[in-house]
Structures are given as structure tokens and as C-alpha cells.
Amino acid sequence: MRVAIETYGCTTNQADSDIMRGFLSGEFELSSVEDAEVVIINSCGVIDFTERKIIRRMLDLKREGKKVVLAGCLTRISKEALSVADSALSPDNLDMVVDAVYSALNGRKLFTERRFIDKAEFSHLKCRLRENAIAIVSISEGCLGKCSFCATKFARGRLRSFSMDAIVREAERAVRAGYREIQLTSQDTGAYGMDKGRAMLPELLRKISEIEGEFRVRVGMMNPQHAVRMLDELINAYSSEKIYKFLHIPVQSGDNRILEDMKRNHTVEDYVEVVEAFRNSFDDVLISTDIIVGFPTETEEAFWKSYELIKETRPDIVNITRYSARKGTPAARLRDIPGWIKKERSRKLTDLMRKIGLENNKRFVGKKLRVLVTKEGKNGRNLARMNSYRAVVTEGAVGEFVEVKIKDCRFNYLIGQLAAEQPQ
């Protein structure tokens, strides 16, 4: 029996797919989607557009005669997606994936009951695709927030932090196996440990930094309200050369009233304090943030506050999302803003983000830098990362640290040439 997994969404889903492949490999032949008889769709439910896309994909696969197992967040968010699937497997039932496949073949059954499983304890089973030098390591499931626009909470639930020792062991195994970039992922890395009584992310980073070998760690998204409360300890942990000086800190709006409506539990000032502290502590920090445009209560004045915040704090990456109502969330009960207004606000913010990104990157042109090559690209050019996680397109073998000279840049990446190839 041939089984394939198709993954959508965040790095947490990618890590979940690695675990499922491990369980499946002992029972089935893992194949491409084209050759598979059963396809597991590991779904994302962040926005309505993605949900519709996934449902269409499931219907297409069924028309081809394939059985479809729905996994991921839509198992708890979308009744329509569940109705299309031949079986379903929620994120806290990954160890039952073999049963879910047999259920799709022999009689529909849903594996969606609420359970707590420490996914770090399954890490030794992971079957990663050796496409690059990156290993994704989950550190927790769920979050402490109650954002009024977010449906992911329905799928992932309250925060459950995984065993620190098991996480460190997984990172150590990955480094020994040749992976050079460890990506720590969760719905909110800054909340790690808080369900156990204290903030434990800095301690986790210190322990991973002590692993022997040359590698880098990318810390995933953390919310401002957690980062600001452990700022000194967090910056101290980031001082290790093994930790990318990369900070993904979503502000979502530049207006505190909108943040209250979103139930974000932080202020604009919290975000600014964290960004300024990191920039004052390190020579080069890559700041990434998220903005939702067109939230139902966002006025024109509120939007321009978001615009001015981005203009003033100059993040390198701004993930811009046009608000879309998710069924069952408090925000879905509010009157929506017309689509053309959302589109126009998104365009203005995108133009600003591209301008700032280009200006931020120009200062590196002409410099020689040591980078880690992490992914294969096209036409002999691969993706590498600076110590700040800034993207560099260059030559070099995946998994190797190389010296490059930056020749040019775009708003979202630098273009480098191997220093050894520079004309004398």
C-alpha cells in the first residue's frame, strides 16, 4: 500500500508530517502523491482562502480515485473538510496515523478526540525528507492566548510544553545526523514552559547551544507579551553564536485599541521595547513581524498607525494578511470591512515593506560574510543564511559554511558570490 503526505502551512505542520512519516514507514510504502493510493492532507486553517484551496485539493484527489485522510488544523475547524475526508486525524493523535489510513480504506472513522501527547518523545521516529540542511523541532503545542480572530486555538488547544530533555536530545540527534539548522517551532515559542509555572525558552536555548558541533538555531514566532517579560534573559541566551539573531515578533496592529479588540494581550509599546532592546544588543538583528489589515474595527486612522509603526521600527520582514473571518471566532460576529479597502491597505503596506527591506539590505552590499548554506535552489544557486538569518542567494554546498561577498540585493534577499571565486 502506497501512502503520501501533502503538507500545508507552518513549520509545526511540517514537524508533524515528519512524525507521521515515521509511524507510516513501518507499515506502508511512502510515495509521491501521484503514485499513492492514500493521501494524508496535513492542513492549515489560518485563513479562509487556504481552507477553500485544501477542500478543492481533497475533492480533486478523490476524483482521481485516491482515499484522503484529513490531518492538521482543519480537523477541528472545518466541518466541510471533514465531510469530504475518508478519515481524519487531529494534531494530538499523530500516533494513530496508521489506524487512520486503514480507516480510510475499510470504513470511515475519525481520530479527533482531545489528548495530550509529548511529540518530543516521538522525535526518534521522525522520518525527515533530506531535501536540505534543516531539522524542525517542535517545543510545544497550543498557546496561552485568546485572539478574537484566530481559529487555530480550536485545533491546537491550550499550551502544553514538551519535555526539555527530549527536545535537546532531538536537536542533538539532528546535529549528529548532519543537519546544520535547527528550527524551534510552536504556536508561540515565547510561552514555552509557562504551563509548568515559568518561562523556560532561555534555558532551552542555552542547553541546545551547549550541543557539540557547528550549527545554527532559528527560534520561531514569539508574542511580544512573553518576550518583554523575559527580555534580559532572552537576550543573554541569544548571545550564543549558535542562535540566529532573528526575531519573529508579531505586532498585528499599530493601534492599541485594535489590539484590545483582537484580544492580543500586548501593546504596541511592548513590541517596540523588545525590538529596540535586541537592536541595542546585537550588530545585526533580522526583525520579522505580522500585520493584519482590515480587521473589522480597523478605521483609516488605525491603519495609518500600523503604517507609521512599520515606518518607524523598520522591520526587515512584514507578513501582511488581509483579515478573513473564521467561523466560531468572536471577530466573525463583527461587520466586515469591504474587500477593496483591505486590498488597498495591503498594497500600501506592501510597498512600504519592500522599500524598507531594500534599504535595510543595501548596507551589506560589498561586504564579505560567512554564511550557512541551508537549501538547494535553482541554476546552481542555493539559499544561505547570515548569522541574523538574513537570506543570501549564492553558490556552495548545502550544509556548509562558506565565505561570500555580497554583490547585490533585493528587498527580501542578498546576492552573494563565493569569496574564493572573486577576481584578483
Swiss-Prot record:
CDD domains per the UniProt record, alphabetical: Radical_SAM (cd01335)
Binding site for [4Fe-4S] cluster 1: C10, C44, C73
Residue spans crossing the bilayer: none
Enzyme class: transferase
EC number(s) recorded for this UniProt protein: 2.8.4.5
Keyword RNA-binding set for record: no
Keyword tRNA processing: yes
SUPFAM superfamilies, sorted: Radical SAM enzymes
Protein's recorded name: Probable threonylcarbamoyladenosine tRNA methylthiotransferase
Source species: Archaeoglobus fulgidus (strain ATCC 49558 / DSM 4304 / JCM 9628 / NBRC 100126 / VC-16)
Taxonomic placement: Archaea, Methanobacteriati, Methanobacteriota, Archaeoglobi, Archaeoglobales
